[in-house]
Amino acid sequence: TLDAFTEKELAGNVINLVGLLFMIGWLSALAILGKELKENGAALGSVASLVFTAVLAILAVSLGLSLGANDLFAEGNKAAAVTLELASESAWYGFPQLLGVGYTLLGLGLVLERNPLPRVLAGLFVLAGVATFILAPINDGLGFLLFLISILLVITSGIFLLRQGN
């Protein structure tokens, strides 16, 4: 990873920046949705919002460590760069579990709220959260598939909420 990034530093930085912006928007939207729950699901929504904020912190720490590793590698300090990159990758290990907890809590809050999303869509948040929490650490490919499904769930929910606002 470090060799590839050093050879194509501009492309790597662009990919990191676009990915970072995407993930900040996605996690912020989930945190805001959790905070918007006002009735029966308010407590679960608030806790989900905190969990999504923690997931965002994992992203920031991991990216910072990885960028530091790339700088050290470019300076020729390969041993320290590899150590930092391993720490960056290790920070990601908690990502699927926290993400699954966040989705589950948000989904339960949405089910209890009965608005703004239909119960089926809210229930899919719960299902995606439980599946991500349990299955993502077992199999990387399955974890990534669950991640993509959860992104589609968020997009679908966003479209539904935007149409409902009109």
Language model regions located:
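Hydrophobic, aromatic-enriched alpha-helical segments typical of multi-pass transmembrane helices
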Residues: T1-N166
